[in-house]
Amino acid sequence: MNDMLYATGTSYEYPLIIKKLFSSMTRYFPSQKIIYRDRAVFTYSELAQRVNRLAGALSALGVQSGDVVGIIDYNSHRFLESFFAVPMMGATLATLNWRLGIDELGHTISHASPRVLLVNEDFSGLVRRTGNALDKVEHLVIIRDSDDPAERPGADAIYYEDILDMAPQDYTFADIDENIPAALYYTAGTTGLPKGVSFTHRQIVLQTLSLALSLGSYSSKIRFTSKDVFMPLVPMWNEHGWGLPFLAAVVGARQVYSGKYDTESLLDLFSRHKITFSVCYPTALHLILEHPLSKDLDFSSCKVIVTGARITEKLAAAALERGINVASSFCMAEGGALVSMSHLKGGLDRGTAKKKTGIICSAGLPAPLVEVGIADSAGQVRKDSDSTPGE
């Protein structure tokens, strides 16, 4: 609390930093659970200890404020730990896309220039094939699920759980400048090589607040609260999993992370943990609804945000028929996790099925704290943008 002391007659200049999201999680919901597949269960308090240990371990490896730490992993509690530990140290977390080709992945690693690279063992061979892209990487830390030392591929490798075990849990996170970079993402599906986009602490906190307002301020069936059980199906390397892991921590939702998955294993997690909130691409929702094992599952308590591509009216109708409360959101790498959202708020859920799907499949309205305009070919934002084509 010493960093909150201030002179009489002055106000505390509250920094919008990820540390403040983290402290809310541990202060209000210390006993809430975070579940990783069938392998690990942590309370928020225990996860906080692991976050402290990760920061201490990275510091011991030489990571300082201003450095970059990269991560290549499936959705996991370890990814979540890096979301907090790395930026709270004053470093930048580069979330790297393992679905890219060798040349593109190598470009992102080379461009990010991480001092330490955290890599799931499934992707270690892929990463090593990027060759010179690793020239500036001082430490390659292997993430693995198995704790059997006999299965380790090399005695000289550094392992994630080992460095956490050796690190103290009393690492102290100081208040830092809210305008320093906290995260580095890379575009996918664009022309040429992936482009890097960085976000500051302030921007990420504001995005989290925008999500909170979008999913908590309206009379809607798409609300996100501490009663929810959240499992993201979008990859965490993409816009921090659309920002929802941060929001889940702030509202105190139970969190479930799938690791490497197929549709059958996802359905098992949905069933066993009674998932009530998720975010996914349209293809994932389609695969879930079409899988034979989903026919016997009750989705009536499930809320799903579909993003990454436009949801079709057919898919939206199929989700509604199964009892899923579905919404769609749009974003872009440069604009953060949420630009607009379309869900059945207010009295919109009382219309016909066709009207409902039409609303869900629309571009929606700009999220709180977001401004949207239509720019013409000269790059000028048009005042009559409601009827003017552009981008």
Predicted features by range, described:
Residues 10, 32-76, 80-84, 101-106, ...:
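Conserved AMP-binding/adenylate-forming core of the ANL superfamily
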